[in-house]
C-alpha cells in the first residue's frame, strides 16, 4: 500500500487484520480486534475502539461500501483491502442464514477415517473432527440446562460467544439450535454415528457462513457496477490458504496436504489478461 500511496492512490483496509501492529500505508483503516467476533464485534477505526451491533460479514462490507461511497477522494485511484473474518472458526452463521441447506446431506470424504499409518506428525495434529471438535464451542450445543460438557477446554468460550448476542439475535439462534440440541441429547450418539453427526453439523454451519460471504461480495460488485467502477477496477478474490472439510478427518488448515496447500484465487481484470484457469 505504501508504494501505491506514492503513486497517488488512496488506500484502505477494512475487516480482519490479525497482526500485533497497527496498519501502516493506509489512508483509512477500520479493523477487527484480533480475528474478531461474528456477532457485535469490536473494530478499531483509525485508532478508536468501537463496538458495532450486527454480524461481522455484513458490518465489514458496510464499512467498505461507506468508504467507497463517502470517505474517499473520488478524483484519485484507490486500493481497498476488504478482509472478512468468515469463514474462520467457529463458523457462526448470520441469523438470516441459519436454516439454509438444512436438508442437505454432505458426502463423507473418502479419507475421513484416515488412521495416519506411517505418518506420526499427521497423527498428532489437534484438528480431528472426531476428538478435537468441541460440541459447544464449534458445534453450538450450548444447552440451557448446562448438561452438555466437553473436555477440550473450549466450552466456556463457546457459551461466551452466545452471551455476547443481543436478545433478538439470541431468539433467532435459539429457534434454530434448540431443537437440534434437544434431538442430539435424546439420541446419545457414539462412535461412527457421533463422528458423522459432527461432520454434518460442521459442514452445514460452514456453508452458511460461506453463503454470507458470497452475498456480501455480491453487494460490493453490485455497488461497483452501479457506480461505474466495475470496468475500471482490478478485483482479486483470494484466501490465505485452503481448508480441510473432513478430509483426513480434519477441520482447520495446519498441515500441508493438498487440501490445505491449494489456495483459491479469482482475478477480474477488465481489458487485461484473458480469463483462464
Walk through the language-model features, giving the residues of each:
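Formylglycine-dependent sulfatase
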Residues: 1-277
Amino acid at each position: 500500500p505504501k508504494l501505491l500511496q506514492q503513486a497517488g492512490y488512496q488506500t484502505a483496509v477494512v475487516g480482519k487484520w490479525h497482526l500485533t501492529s497497527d496498519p501502516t500505508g493506509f489512508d483509512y483503516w477500520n479493523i477487527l480486534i484480533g480475528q474478531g467476533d461474528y456477532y457485535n464485534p469490536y473494530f478499531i477505526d483509525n485508532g478508536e475502539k468501537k463496538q458495532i451491533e450486527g454480524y461481522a460479514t455484513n458490518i465489514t462490507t458496510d464499512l467498505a461500501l461507506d468508504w467507497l461511497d463517502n470517505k474517499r477522494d473520488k478524483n484519485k485511484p484507490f486500493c481497498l483491502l476488504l478482509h472478512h473474518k468468515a469463514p474462520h472458526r467457529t463458523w457462526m452463521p448470520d441469523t438470516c442464514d441459519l436454516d439454509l441447506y438444512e436438508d442437505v446431506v454432505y458426502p463423507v470424504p473418502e479419507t475421513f477415517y484416515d488412521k495416519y499409518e506411517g505418518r506420526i506428525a499427521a497423527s498428532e495434529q489437534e484438528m480431528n473432527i472426531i476428538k478435537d471438535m468441541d460440541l459447544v464451542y464449534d458445534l453450538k450445543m450450548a444447552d440451557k440446562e448446562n448438561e452438555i460438557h466437553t473436555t477440550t477446554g473450549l466450552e466456556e468460550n463457546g457459551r461466551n460467544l452466545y452471551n455476547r448476542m443481543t436478545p433478538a439475535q439470541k431468539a433467532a439462534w435459539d429457534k434454530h439450535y434448540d431443537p437440534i440440541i434437544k434431538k442430539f441429547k435424546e439420541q446419545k450418539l457414539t462412535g461412527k454415528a457421533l463422528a458423522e453427526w459432527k461432520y454434518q453439523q460442521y459442514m452445514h454451519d460452514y456453508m452458511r457462513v460461506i453463503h454470507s460471504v458470497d452475498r456480501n461480495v455480491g453487494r460490493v460488485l453490485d455497488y461497483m457496477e452501479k457506480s461505474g467502477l466495475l470496468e475500471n477496477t482490478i478485483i482479486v478474490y483470494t484466501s490465505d490458504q485452503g481448508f480441510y472439510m473432513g478430509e483426513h478427518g480434519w477441520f482447520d488448515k495446519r498441515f500441508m496436504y493438498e487440501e490445505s496447500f491449494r489456495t483459491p484465487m479469482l482475478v477480474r481484470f477488465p481489458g487485461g489478461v484473458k480469463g483462464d484457469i
